[in-house]
Amino acid sequence: MPLHKVPVGLWKRLRLREGIYSRLPAHYLRSLEEARTPTPVHFRPHGAKFKINPKNGQRERVEDVPIPVHYPPESQLGLWGGEGWLKGHRYVNNDKFSKRVKKVWKPQLFQRELYSEILDTRFTVTVTMRTLDLIDEAYGFDFYILKTPKEDLCSKFGMDLKRGMLLRLARQDPQLHPDDPERRAAIYDKYKAFVIPEAEAEWVGLTLDEAVEKQRLLEEKDPVPLFKVYVEELVEQLQQQALSEPAVVQKRANRT
């Protein structure tokens, strides 16, 4: 007899159907459920279920087993390109007959200054060589942030940048190069393929706790008094009535 009525692996998904979680926007809940497999970084996938053994020529079954990666809190403040810490063991003095001790492999980190066209800001970010290569492949820092999915960014800082970029693109913010409208229009046209509604952009990159807090604040807004609603409706009706009625022009008497 099973210990739990529902498997433990489904608890997080079922929690989204109850309480305030169920009232989160549909597009945000969909982004949680449609989690994709991250791009392999620390191992090379076989790309097939079977391979030929070069020694005996027999077909053997192979399986892609991802290496467990640990992402420290520092990785959320930079852009590591999916790299993290690998925990394992090594032999003392590279001698297999010696004692085996624990070892942690860490990526090499660099401090680089990256410029965002959309935000018109320079950021000093901790990056890896893989991140710089990915930025070059994407033809720019903004393209890298906008194109890379959440599972491959592996960075809270990167997702916050993406939310800021999407909000500026959705609002067509005139504060971007206010003295050069042609340059501003060229930038917005360059990234127009990534434009999404502002209501969706506000939720991009939020953790579940942040999304719940945002939803709670939206629901706890002070209600608008009814007299204000009625006054606004009355003003609109009077304005429409004034526009629909023909204007009467009185002629002045000619002085002799």
Curated annotation (Swiss-Prot):
GO terms for cellular component: mitochondrial inner membrane; mitochondrial large ribosomal subunit; mitochondrial ribosome. Keywords: Mitochondrion, Ribonucleoprotein, Ribosomal protein, Transit peptide. It comes from the Eukaryota. It is found in: Mitochondrion. Residues 1-55 form a transit peptide. GO terms for molecular function: structural constituent of ribosome. The keyword Transit peptide applies. It holds the Pfam family Ribosomal_L28. Belongs to the bacterial ribosomal protein bL28 family. Component of the mitochondrial ribosome large subunit (39S) which comprises a 16S rRNA and about 50 distinct proteins. Interacts with OXA1L. This is Large ribosomal subunit protein bL28m. It comes from Bos taurus.
